[in-house]
Curated annotation (Swiss-Prot):
Catalytic residues, chain numbering: H468
Keyword Transport tagged: no
Reactions catalysed: [phosphate](n) + ATP = [phosphate](n+1) + ADP
Positions annotated to bind ATP: N57, Y501, R597, H625
HAMAP family (alphabetical): Polyphosphate_kinase (MF_00347)
PTM text: An intermediate of this reaction is the autophosphorylated ppk in which a phosphate is covalently linked to a histidine residue through a N-P bond.
Sample GO molecular function, one term: ATP binding
GO cellular component, one term: membrane
UniProt name for this protein: Polyphosphate kinase
Species assigned in the record: Synechocystis sp. (strain ATCC 27184 / PCC 6803 / Kazusa)
UniProt region (Disordered), positions on chain: 694-728
Keywords noted in UniProt: ATP-binding, Kinase, Magnesium, Metal-binding, Nucleotide-binding, Phosphoprotein, Repeat, Transferase
Length: 728
């Protein structure tokens, strides 16, 4: 344990002043995402993408985090967070902090980006500004394609307020009966089955031939709003206003009471679709008070839950514009490269009626026996490394068993198809499919059923725990011996997100790791109560204890006259035990650099507490997702990668695995990655003691150092030196 420094003042690390609020820290993260959309150094259509991500992130935040806080308020929960706030206080501060960001998002889109789009020949017009010819075209389009799928729902004593589905766009329509002069209210849902933006053909919009033109269109809801007469014949349309509702979408299952977890999750998904309580109302800023009050009452919301939007609602639909053929307005495309160690690995290709055949080359197992392989995605190809490892295992005649954890995968997953092929080839295949992966529950249920149909042993996880670890175990017969090959990573087995997220993975056949992973899978699929592992750090078994011990060890080195150094990269830092250990280490003189993309509850730079701790966040083209933990250890350096963040949920309520990387060249590679990230002055933000983030700016464009650009350039340089490394 760390001993108190004689000169260190006594500090109560439980003092709320030493912690940032989790929810407000997350909002600060999303503000950094928004900034990418505001930054004129970002390509134009990529700026729209970041506005869409900002909106999509907020949707999930309200569906889960705000919904949870509201449930706590309703249950009269008054327990304080580490930063000293009640649930009610957090809701008020979320609302106060978020409103300027939402306003900023809409202002920059309506008054900056739309003009820039027009300069590039992309016109998102308002219906009121259209020519007569354009209106005639849209009226016919409405009759042919929109009107047949609309359903007006009256609201009166005989027609109760209709159910408003989660995240749907709706028109609140006020009509007047000319016979009785009575005003009536109706709701019209904007069909989610139709494109959000209706394109106008070139011959209709007639663009200026002397200016660039690529696309012209109008929001779908405006086309509906200006053609409502056909929905309410005989009525006078008084007004209509767009609104959007967000509902609680979290899933709660009493696992110990569920006879069949899959069926229980399915039932909760049905409840999510049918609808839980509303948590947010987004509404046009011009909506009159009587309509606003009516919606609030019918949805059970208060003023704090209502967000006035001056412009387009539901900006996550801006993802559409990334599909336009305008490469000059997007990030420069590039392809992942084949890791140098794997360039001569054979691939399986479609064969004759006997199935797949292999090309000439070296099998991946031979290469793994020659030394561990570290892969860095997306700079190095997931398909040519991890996916290839699993595919070869599926077809290799010497492989006996494949075991794997699946947390999230793609809709047309080649990983799942390889596991099915392995089962069909007579191998024993066991897969833990985590049914509780938020917003991927339905996808995972479908994969679980498909795997079971082909004879794969499928388990759904452990009661009370989410299995978040990213692990594969392959058991292979090699002569008289059995050898175990493993992959342990930081990211999901998803070829699509592997192109967008930065992640790391270790492929090895080190016996102690094979033994550890065997014990871990026995823990996941059977009744094993493994309490310790030779090499792996496993949550909830020993990870927090070991992490705290390694932090304390660095402090001990300092207290004994040596050097202490910690560098850790993760998505979020929330766990108070870890934070207190870091504070104590900082007091002892340990130099600590933290690369935390999202939530950070640790307050850096506080005198006599955390003046030796620096925190940066890297936000860029790719989502930083890898977790790396470096400890100097008196010169006997240790470095780990894995699936866990330093969050209480990861360390106590999830199954996680973190692995030491011990091969010297790979340790050096990981240290180089950390060094490049820490030197980033293009996409890095520094966390200040007051909770604000300040973006680093190079003194000149020539001095710009973007870590993601450097990693990309390094990968491309490898292909320049060796064209065989270009990924297919």
């Amino acid at each position: 344990m760390i001993q108190a420094m004689p000169s260190a003042p006594t500090v109560d690390f439980k003092d709320p002043a030493y912690y940032f609020n989790r929810e407000l820290s997350w909002l600060a993260f999303n503000q950094r995402v928004l900034h990418e959309g505001l930054d004129d150094r970002t390509p134009l259509l990529e700026r729209l993408k970041f506005l869409a991500i900002f909106c999509s992130n907020l949707d999930e935040f309200f569906m889960v985090r705000v919904a949870g806080l509201k449930q706590q308020v309703e249950a009269n929960v008054t327990k304080l967070t580490a930063d000293g706030r009640t649930p009610s206080q957090q809701l008020k501060e979320i609302s106060k902090s978020l409103r300027p960001l939402v306003y900023q998002q809409n202002q920059v889109f309506e008054y900056v980006l739309k003009e820039k789009l027009a300069d590039e020949g992309i016109f998102l017009n308002d219906y009121v500004d259209l020519s007569q010819e354009e209106r005639q075209y849209l009226h016919q389009f409405y009759d042919d394609h929109i009107f047949p799928v609309l359903t007006p729902l009256a609201v009166d004593p005989s027609h109760p307020f209709p159910y408003i589905s989660n995240l749907s766009l709706n028109l609140g329509v006020v009509v007047r009966d000319p016979d009785t002069d009575e005003e009536l209210f109706a709701r019209v849902k904007v069909p989610p089955t139709l494109p959000r933006f209706v394109a106008l053909p070139e011959d209709v919009c007639q663009p200026d031939p002397n200016k660039p033109w690529l696309w012209t269109g109008v929001p779908l809801e405006q086309v509906i709003a200006h053609n409502l007469a056909s929905l309410f014949p005989g009525m006078i349309i008084q007004e209509c206003h767009l609104f959007r509702v967000t509902r609680n979408a979290d899933i709660a299952v009493e696992e110990d009471e569920a006879d069949d977890l899959l069926l229980a999750i399915e039932e909760e998904l049905r409840k999510r679709r049918v609808g839980k309580s509303a948590v947010r109302l987004e509404i046009n800023a011009s909506t009159p008070k009587n309509i606003r009050d009516r919606l609030m009452t019918d949805l059970g919301l208060e003023e704090i839950d209502v967000y006035d939007i001056d412009g387009l609602l539901g900006l996550k639909d801006l993802f559409f514009f990334l599909s336009l053929p305008a490469p000059h307005l997007k990030d420069e495309p590039w392809a992942s490269v084949i890791p140098p160690r794997l360039k001569h690995v054979y691939e399986f290709v479609d064969g004759d009626e006997d199935g797949r055949v292999q090309q000439e080359g070296i099998d991946i197992f031979t290469l793994i026996r020659q030394g561990d392989i570290l892969v860095h995605h997306p700079y190095q190809s997931f398909t040519a490394s991890v996916q290839q490892f699993i595919t070869q295992a599926a077809y290799d005649p010497h492989v006996l068993t494949i075991k794997m954890t699946l947390y999230r995968t793609s809709g047309d997953s080649p990983i799942v198809n390889a596991l099915i092929a392995a089962a069909e080839n007579g191998k024993q295949v066991a897969v833990l499919v985590e049914l509780k992966a938020r917003f991927d529950e339905e996808n995972n249920i479908n994969w679980a059923r498909k795997l079971e149909q082909y004879g794969v042993h499928v388990v759904y996880g452990l009661v009370g725990l989410k299995t978040h670890t990213k692990t594969v175990l392959v058991v292979r017969q090699e002569g008289p011996d059995i050898r175990r090959y493993v992959h342990i990573g930081t990211g999901n087995y998803n070829p699509k997100t592997a192109k967008l997220y930065t992640d790391l993975g270790l492929i090895t056949c080190r016996p102690e790791l094979g033994n550890d992973l065997t014990n871990l899978f026995n823990f996941l699929t059977g009744y094993s109560r493994q309490k310790d592992y030779q090499k792996l750090l496993v949550a909830p078994v020993n990870m927090r204890e070991r992490m705290v011990a390694m932090i304390e060890r660095e402090a001990d080195h300092c207290l004994n006259g040596g050097t202490g150094r910690i560098v850790a990269k993760m998505n979020s830092l929330v766990d108070t035990q870890i934070i207190r250990a870091l504070y104590a280490a900082s007091q002892a003189g340990v130099q600590i650099d933290l690369i935390v993309r999202g939530i950070c509850c640790l307050r850096p730079g506080v005198e006599n507490v955390s003046e030796n701790i620096r925190v940066i966040s890297v936000i860029g083209r790719l989502l930083e997702h890898s977790r790396i933990f470096y400890f100097h250890n008196g010169g006997e350096e240790e470095i780990y990668i894995g699936s866990a963040d330093w969050m209480s949920r990861n360390l106590t309520r999830r199954v996680e695995a973190v692995v030491p990387v011990e091969q010297p060249d790979l340790k050096q590679e990981l240290q180089s990655i950390l060094g490049i990230l820490l030197a980033d002055n293009r996409q890095a933000w520094e966390l200040q003691p007051d909770g604000t983030y300040v973006q680093r700016r190079p003194a000149s464009p020539e001095q710009s150092q973007s870590s993601q650009a450097i990693f990309t350039a390094q990968a491309i340089a490898e292909t320049t030196e060796d064209p065989e490394l270009r990924s297919v």
